[in-house]
Amino acid sequence: MNLASRMHGPHKRSALMRFSMSGRLTPLLIGLLCISLVGATLEFGHGHLHVLTAKINPQVVIPQYPNGPGGQDVLRLSRTASSIGEDPEFLSVTLLPGRGMNVFQIMALVPGRGDVPLLASPSLASAASLLNGQGVDSSGTNSTALGGALLLPWARRLTGAPVSSDASTPLLQTEWQGQMFQVPADAPGSSTSVEGLLLKQATSTVQTEVLPDGQSAFAVFQPGSFSGQWPSSLEITVRVELEAHDLDLTMTAKNTGGRPMPLGAGWQPIFSLPSSGRGSALLMIPSTTVSEVDHGTMLPTGRTVSVAHTPLDFSSAGGTRLGPGGIDETYTDLHKSPQAAEPVAELRDPASDLLLRLVALSPSITNLHVLAPLNKNWISISPNTNFDDPLGPEWASPHSSGMVTLAPGESLQWKVRLEIGRISTLAGAN
C-alpha cells in the first residue's frame, strides 16, 4: 500500500479509539475518580492531607540571615512586583528580631528609578558592628539611629536624676504615682533616658505566613518588668504585614503583672529623602500646633502653640517644600483628612511622582514628632502615643502627656499603615 492509499483509503481504528467508542470508557473514568477520592480521604485520616495541599499550593520560603544583631537571624519579608513597573509598590521589608523588631529597611519598586531603599540604613554588615550592645549601645540606643525603631514602654525620652555614671550602664531614677524606678540614661551622668526599653530586646518567638499579595511576621516578646526597670510585667506582640501598596505595623502591649503601669508606644522611621535633595521633597503634616519647648531645658512646657502660617506649617493639602532649614517639632492635635477616618501625613517626591502616606490607625496616637536636621538628606516622622518627658511635672494630668495607665490584664494597641503610590493617584484620597 502506497502513501496515498494509507492517507485516503479505508484504515483500521486504533485500539484506544475503538475502546473509547465502545461505551466502556466513562464507567472506567468514574471508577478511577472514586479511587482517587478514597485515597485522599485516607491521607486526611492519617494527617497527610497537608502534604498533598503543599504540593498543589507551595508556600513561599521566607529567607533568614544568620548572625544578625542581637543574636537572632535577620528576617526579610518579600513579594514579587505585580504592576509591571506602572506604579510604585513595596518589594520587601527587613526586620531585626534580635533588636526589638527594628524595621531596618523597606525596599520599593519606583518607576524610572528601579529598586529604591526608603529608609536611611547602612548595610547589614555595618549595622552588626553598630548594634553590638556594648558601650554607647549598652541599652540599645544605636537602634534609634537607623531604620525604624519600635518604641515601648514609652516613646521619646523620660527625665530623672542620674544615679549611675558608669559608662557601661548609666542609669537615672524617675517616679510614677509614688513609685521610684531606674531606667537607662542616654549617656553617663545624663538626666534624660534612652527611647524605651524594647530597643535591644530579642523576640521569644517569631512566626511568618504568606498573604494573598505578600507576607507577614508575628513576633512575641516576654520582657517581664525589663529586669525590674518598669513597675509591672509586659507581654508585647508585633505584627508586620507587607503587601503591594500597604505596610501595616501593629504593636500590642499587655500588663501581665499584678500592678498598674504607665505605657506609651511609638515608631521612629528614618525616611531617605529624594536623591535630588531635600529641597524637592514635599511634606504634609495634619496639624498646625506643636508642643511648646522650654529652650533652656529643651523639655516640653506642657502647653501647645500655633505654627499656622509660619515656616513650620506643613498642613497644606498639596504639601510644603522642606527647604534647607532644620525641623525638630512635635505636632499635636492631629486632624483627620476629609476623605479618611484617621490622621494622615505625607512625604512626596514630585520628580518621581512618588507618594508615601503614613496613616495613624490607632486613636491612642496623639502626636507626630518630625525630625529633619539641617542639611541632612533624611526625615523622621514618628507617630507616638505620648509626648516627650511624659512622666514630668509639667503635665496637668498623667493622661495629658499621652501615657496611659494599664491595670493588670489590660492592653494597649498601637497601629500605623505606610502606603505607597503615585502622587497623581493617591493624593486625591487625602
Stretch-by-stretch model annotation:
Residues M1-S22:
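N-terminal Lys/Arg-rich, disordered targeting/topogenic segments
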Residues R18-D248, T256-P262, G266-N430:
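Surface-exposed acidic/polar loop and edge beta-strand patches at domain peripheries
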